[in-house]
């Protein structure tokens, strides 16, 4: 059960990290646009962009998960 949850989380983060979509921000019209609140889409876009910066750590996590699957969760 724990192994399935770890595998699900790992695959979900991998999917977010390898997306190659061009996620663009909205064009700002002037000085007053900075005061508006971020929408849910903006928050998701920022999260996916931040995942791209952690690709090396995600790769190390994948290697660790493969090791755990063989040693701990294998039968």
Swiss-Prot record:
Keywords: Membrane, Signal, Transmembrane, Transmembrane helix. It comes from the Eukaryota. GO terms for cellular component: membrane. Disulfide bonds: none annotated. Residues 1-17 form the signal peptide. The chain crosses the membrane at residues 54-74. Belongs to the SMIM7 family. This is Small integral membrane protein 7-B. It comes from Xenopus laevis.
């Amino acid at each position: 059960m724990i192994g399935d949850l770890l595998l699900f989380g790992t695959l979900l983060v991998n999917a977010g990290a390898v997306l190659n979509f061009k996620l663009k921000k909205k064009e700002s019209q002037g000085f007053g646009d900075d005061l508006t609140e971020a929408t849910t889409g903006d928050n998701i876009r920022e999260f996916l962009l931040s995942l791209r910066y952690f690709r090396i750590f995600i790769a190390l996590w994948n290697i660790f998960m493969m090791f755990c699957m063989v040693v701990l969760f294998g039968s």
